[in-house]
Amino acid sequence: EAFNIGTQTSDYPGLGLSEAVYQPNVWPAAEGERVPEGMKQFRANLERWFHAAAQTARTLTGVFEHALNVPEGTITALASHSVDVLRCINYVLPPGTSAKVDDEQMGMGEHTDYGIVTILWADRVAGLQVLGTEGQWHDVVPEPGALLVNLGDVMARLTNDQWLSTLHRVKPPVENGVIRRRRAAAFFHDGNEDAVVHPLPGMVDASHPPLYKPLTIGEHLLAKLGGSKGLQINNRDTEREAARVLASART
């Protein structure tokens, strides 16, 4: 089961943002209805987590600028009204049910995240795997109190693939033949819908020709979402990223 919230048009009044992209959040109880106290706390906690994760993402993009030796604000300017999404997932079987899984079954197949950076909280339960540079999958279990950070496809485009987006997957958390409960909260910091993505200063030279054509983050997200839902690559500029995912599925 999963529950999502994200950036809304009301978060940035006066910018004329598209409500199709910056959609209003839908909570279990509508405005004006009697809301159980526990549900009020659920909303307050989730909104607090959303804003804290957004601040962490902004801090990280500033760190990225320093590490890449680009002018301050170069990357953060692409996310002044970022399309951000917090997705909370509870991998659990209904009470009284059981299931058998084989070694090839996935909770979520090989993929990269679409945006700039992802901030992930997860239980200390095995399941998440990351593909290493040597081509092997590695289990990732966070240290107590730690967050996991994935680079997204926008970051790969900005660095002309000098920093690659993190290829990862989720396997069912099985222990002694029983699927264990696993929870995760992923904050996707994708950037402004209208921001144009092209290589940062210093990322292109005679030895490193441009690998991607400029496009807006909105166009990039639309191509990614359309491809994943339609099981096709509907934008030729996504072929490079798709090839990495397909190659990883064979390892």
Question: Over which residues does each language-model region extend?
Answer:
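Peripheral, non-catalytic segments flanking oxidoreductase cores
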Residues: 1-251
